[in-house]
């Protein structure tokens, strides 16, 4: 799962039991990245 640190804006990959902390700056607030693809929904 890909996250972005809210302080240093770097991409962070978290492991399943690694804890929630940025390995670069130590900040504990991580933002979940959205999927880059756009979904199309048919409208009737």
From Swiss-Prot:
Record-linked Gene3D superfamilies: RNA polymerase ii, chain L (2.20.28.30)
SMART domains associated with the record: RPOLCX
Cofactor, how bound (note): Binds 1 zinc ion.
Cellular localisation: Cytoplasm
Residue ranges of the TM segments: none
Record-linked InterPro entries: RNAP_P/RPABC4 (IPR006591), RPABC4/Spt4 (IPR029040), Rpo12 (IPR023464)
Cofactors named for this entry: Zn(2+)
EC number, UniProt record: 2.7.7.6
Annotated keywords: Cytoplasm, DNA-directed RNA polymerase, Metal-binding, Nucleotidyltransferase, Transcription, Transferase, Zinc
Record function comment: DNA-dependent RNA polymerase (RNAP) catalyzes the transcription of DNA into RNA using the four ribonucleoside triphosphates as substrates.
Similarity comment: Belongs to the archaeal Rpo12/eukaryotic RPC10 RNA polymerase subunit family.
Subunit (UniProt): Part of the RNA polymerase complex.
Protein's UniProt name: DNA-directed RNA polymerase subunit Rpo12
Native organism: Haloquadratum walsbyi (strain DSM 16790 / HBSQ001)
């Amino acid at each position: 799962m890909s996250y972005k640190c809210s302080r240093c804006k770097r991409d962070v990959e978290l492991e399943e039991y690694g804890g929630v902390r940025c390995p670069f700056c130590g900040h504990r607030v991580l933002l979940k990245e959205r999927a880059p693809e756009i979904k199309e929904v048919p409208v009737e």
